[in-house]
Amino acid sequence: MKNIRKTHPLIKIINHSFIDLPTPSNISAWWNFGSLLGVCLGIQILTGLFLAMHYTSDTMTAFSSVTHICRDVNYGWLIRYMHANGASMFFICLFLHVGRGIYYGSCLFTETWNIGIILLFAVMATAFMGYVLPWGQMSFWGATVITNLLSAIPYIGTTLVEWIWGGFSVDKATLTRFFAFHFILPFIITALVMVHLLFLHETGSNNPSGINSDSDKIPFHPYFTIKDILGFLLLISFMMSLVLFSPDLLGDPDNYTPANPLNTPPHIKPEWYFLFAYAILRSIPNKLGGVLALVFSILILALFPLLQLSKQRSMMFRPISQCMFWILTADLLTLTWIGGQPVEHPFIIIGQVASILYFLNILVMLPMASLLENKLLKW
């Protein structure tokens, strides 16, 4: 009798994806972030489901329903803060996962990479809409400012914004539809994750050396299941430390004030994981130009497979490219810092320089470093 794991139509798929999957023997801890993102998604869907049981998407009661969850629901405070900080964990893992893809040349799996970019946009949209739901000051004004950016689109902009709002301002209709989309998107993300994995398993995983590893593969289970479980434990430990010791560390105090359309907060800023893009948006004086720069700051990831001019896939043995990569990382951290600062000197000029460096690094410096290293190979 053959093993059910290898014959059952459904279990067979799981077996080929997580158990008997041939995996390069030398993949490092940087390859853990895919599974960690899966865990984050699972945590977010579960905690979100329980929050949705008690939340009301009405402008009059949304804020007090969140207060009710934190005060009156059994472990409601825990579920709420796990959901809020789970989003931060999600983005930390996302950024590291994308960074790994760039550093080790995994972006050359173009289908997997492009689905990943769509996933990134979907997760960002979900996080943005989720931030609006508690209906605090920053929720309301964040929603107003970000949706208003679409009015920069020529001719149809204003109509488009009012269509998204469901009226002439961010109000009940906006909150209700944002809740609906915030609920449905994670399930769309789950479906996209399956497509992402489908394309990945067509080619097999990359590895740190960037060299074909068909001659040295080992089964995913037990070697990498154990390795992934260690990652899960570290992630959950870090997340629960944040939730239980300083749950509001990454949040904005303004969001503990109920939304008031008549009172604008002094500094409107999104959650920390959007600050780099927000800094790029603010660094351009023209509205449409800023919106385009904002979109292209993420969309530029789609160009990475085309800008890979090196004869070597991975950056592991390319010190000049490594240098450019870490300059890019430092630049993104600088942009994140600037995004949270008020619009005044010297922050304006730092933001503008960092924004130029961001695009310059990706479009010019990294490809030139690759070409230079190709020349050095001939010496």
UniProtKB/Swiss-Prot annotation:
A ubiquinone binds at H201. The chain crosses the membrane at residues 33-53, 77-98, 113-133, 178-198, 226-246, 288-308, 320-340, 347-367. Heme 1 (or BL or b562) is low-potential and absorbs at about 562 nm, and heme 2 (or BH or b566) is high-potential and absorbs at about 566 nm. This is Cytochrome b. It is a multi-pass membrane protein. One of its GO terms (cellular component) is respiratory chain complex III. InterPro entries: Cyt_b/b6_C, Cyt_b/b6_C_sf, Cyt_b/b6_N, Cytb/b6-like_sf, Cytochrome_b, Cytochrome_b_C_euk/bac, Cytochrome_b_N_euk/bac, Di-haem_cyt_TM. One of its GO terms (biological process) is mitochondrial electron transport, ubiquinol to cytochrome c. It comes from Eliomys quercinus. Heme b b566 binds at H97, H196. The cytochrome bc1 complex contains 11 subunits: 3 respiratory subunits (MT-CYB, CYC1 and UQCRFS1), 2 core proteins (UQCRC1 and UQCRC2) and 6 low-molecular weight proteins (UQCRH/QCR6, UQCRB/QCR7, UQCRQ/QCR8, UQCR10/QCR9, UQCR11/QCR10 and a cleavage product of UQCRFS1). This cytochrome bc1 complex then forms a dimer. Keywords: Electron transport, Heme, Iron, Membrane, Metal-binding, Mitochondrion, Mitochondrion inner membrane, Respiratory chain, Transmembrane, Transmembrane helix, Transport, Ubiquinone. It is found in: Mitochondrion inner membrane. Component of the ubiquinol-cytochrome c reductase complex (complex III or cytochrome b-c1 complex) that is part of the mitochondrial respiratory chain. The b-c1 complex mediates electron transfer from ubiquinol to cytochrome c. Contributes to the generation of a proton gradient across the mitochondrial membrane that is then used for ATP synthesis. Binds 2 heme b groups non-covalently. The gene is MT-CYB. Its cofactor is heme b. Heme b b562 binds at H83, H182. GO terms for molecular function: metal ion binding; ubiquinol-cytochrome-c reductase activity.
